[in-house]
Amino acid sequence: MSDLQKRLQRFFNAHHIAVVGASAKNGWFANVLANAAWIGADTRFYPVNPGADEVCGVGACRSIAALPEGVIDFAAILVKEEQVLDVLAQLRSRGIVNVLLFSSGYGETGAAGREKQRAVEDYCRREGMLLMGPNCLGYMNFHARISMFLG
């Protein structure tokens, strides 16, 4: 199996998922949890929210730095577009290189958004990060019972 195949395997079969920007206010994280329960996912979620010790009944970390070391397979990003590059750098510094970017405000908004998207893509490429997104709904792996889907 090639290095890329191994990385994709870990990306699509993640069992320890950080959700940066998880909040009970907007309902997105609640959707993620509901979809994971529906598919019977064997997934542990680690919501990251600087203002909460718990999000939707799941114990939260107040920062990316507070995530358990060497455990996280994958990170989903639910923050505003202007925070994304900083979040990516923090994740990379923790060795988290598999990323799903839910955030919008990129190519779908026009030329300025395409430039912002290019900056995110360039950063991820340069840092060896696998990126799905931006502005996507996520994925479900029915075979492995993994759900990282907002819909």
Tell me the role of every PLM-derived stretch.
Residues M1-G151:
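Catalytic-core regions of core metabolic enzymes
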